[in-house]
Every structure is written in structure tokens, then in C-alpha cells.
Amino acid sequence: MIDPVNNFKIPEEWIALTGLPREELEKNVASGMVVVLSDGSVLKRGYTTGTTASAAAKAAVLSLKKKIDSVSVPTPVGLRAHLEVSESSPGRAVVKKILNDHESDITRGLEFVGEAREAEGIHVLGGKGIGVVRRDGLQVPKGKPAINPKPMEQIRAAVKEAVEELGLQGAEVTISIPEGERIGKETLNSRIGVEGGISVLGSTGFVEPWNDHLGETRGDLIRCTDKVVLTTGRIGMRYSHMLFPEYTVVMVGSRISEGLDYASGDIIICGLPGLVLKWGNPEMLEGSGYATVVEMLEKAPQHERLKEAFEMAVEKGKGARIVVIDRDGSVLMDSKSES
């Protein structure tokens, strides 16, 4: 059984621990809407702001010609997302961002409003409640609505479906979020240069049911728990939650040593080899003939420097369990199993 959102092959022992009928679990997993954890827990994913905006945009276009009460839109991972339309009138539709098991998702339940009119070609505009980028260096140019490239592609694809279904030449859609400006003040948007609302985000179309814990709260979070996983990035974050559901998972990036300084109790360091092993031995590639740790792993998986770097990571970990995973979530090295 494979999770289609992250392509993770769910171990049979995890499936057995859920206690759910296999057919029911397979159906839920195939939809992309649930995540299975190593203790058998099944958590509910939600849809991103990008998926919700796509649904509102498509529904608004369809409502130009007919009454709409639900809509299906594409997602970046190839799955279809199915959302209810809470309100519709000619050229206008409202879709609510569905609830999920991510307790800190402050955008849950927000209303997204799409307003459409016929036009030449496809045009997507940001309305009230969608932030505006006020600085250079972000994925979206300065002065533009804070709709990241991937969700913008998703919205345009959804509008294109509606235009083709109705036989129109095109449509202009304005997306707004009535409570977006208020909610935006509770996010980090102002610090990164986005003002006036929230950002429309989402690389997969689905919201994972856990927190990234980005920013200055990380140290406090690590201090306040006695069972913590320090992970290096979003891939590590995703699989750490699945592998170690009883732990608080905190993304520390390359600041593993800093995270360790905050931590006490039962500590796990989990992440991709490029960060974990190079943290163990920053000079492991010098004179090796390999450009990256991944290249060394692929071409010489028994290379002595891999073992040395792992042993050095274990030593630097001062008793922490060190777990190295690949991009599919498979465990490559584990100090617990090797001790």
C-alpha cells in the first residue's frame, strides 16, 4: 500500500496496527486524505490554500452557466481533490478550507471566494485577504499577489477545466479571502515581506497533519518536551512523524548542534544523509572524488567514509539516536539497530 502524496510504501505491520478493514484503509490512503503512522494511528490530511483557491476559482467559472454545489480540481501530485461549494450565484462561488488533524493550521475553515467573468484567455487575480509581496527574493515578484508558482499553476489548470467544460474562450477570476487580512497578522508573513493577508501555498495540494515549527519557537518547543526528534528538513519532518509518532518533531535544518543544546531526555536526530552525515563529518567529501553524499551512497554504499561520518554523528549526538533516511522514507542507518 503506497501513500500517493509522498510515495511512501506503508509497512504491513503499520497497516495491521490500524485495526481497520484493509479495503477501507486502501480507499482512504488512495484518496490522499489520510496518513498512516508507525503505531497504527491514522491522521487526516486537509487541502492546502492552493487547492481551496483552485476549487473556488473553478466553481466561480462553472457558476456562470449552472448551479454548483461541489467541484473537483487537480492537485500537483496528480490526485483529484473534491470540495463542497458552500455558496454559489452566477459568477461567484464560496469554498471553505476543510478541517484536518493539523491542530496549528490557522487557515482551517477559512472561506475562499471566487468571482469570475468571461474573458479572452485565463487570468487569475488576487483580491482582498490575499497578501501582496513587498520585498524581492521571494518566489513571487514584488508587487504581485502572494500566490506561489505551484498553486498558481493549480488554479489556472482548474479554471482551464471549467472554461473547456463550458466552451468559453476564457475567464478572469478574482480570488479573495474575507478573513485573510486578520489571519495574515497571526502568520510570519509580515516578517518575510508579505502584507495585507495570507499567502496561497501548497506544493502537493494536501496539508500534512503536523506542524513545521519554523522560526523562533523551536528552542522553546525542544526545551519543553522530553521526547523529541530533531530533523533536517521537510522530508525528514514528514517521515519522522510517521516513524516516531510518540515524539515531538522539530525541524532544525543544519542547526543540529544548536537543537541538541536545547534538548534533554529521549532525543532522536533523523534526516537525509547529506545533512546528517556531513554534520557528523563536514569534511567527509574532501579528496573522495564524489561531489555529494548522495552520489557516494549510490556509487559506493560501503565506502568507509560513510561509516566514519555516521560514527562521528553518533559521537556528536552525545547519546541521541541517529537515524538516516532516504527520500522515500527508508531507514539507511540507525544507531539503535547498530549498537
Curated annotation (Swiss-Prot):
Belongs to the CbiD family. Its EC number is 2.1.1.195. This is Cobalt-precorrin-5B C(1)-methyltransferase. GO terms for molecular function: cobalt-precorrin-5B C1-methyltransferase activity. It catalyses: Co-precorrin-5B + S-adenosyl-L-methionine = Co-precorrin-6A + S-adenosyl-L-homocysteine. Pfam families: CbiD. Pathway: Cofactor biosynthesis; adenosylcobalamin biosynthesis; cob(II)yrinate a,c-diamide from sirohydrochlorin (anaerobic route): step 6/10. The keyword Transmembrane does not apply. GO terms for biological process: anaerobic cobalamin biosynthetic process; methylation. Gene3D superfamilies: CbiD-like (3.30.2110.10), CbiD-like domains (3.40.50.10720). InterPro entries: CbiD (IPR002748), CbiD_sf (IPR036074). It comes from the Archaea. It comes from Methanosarcina mazei (strain ATCC BAA-159 / DSM 3647 / Goe1 / Go1 / JCM 11833 / OCM 88) (Methanosarcina frisia).
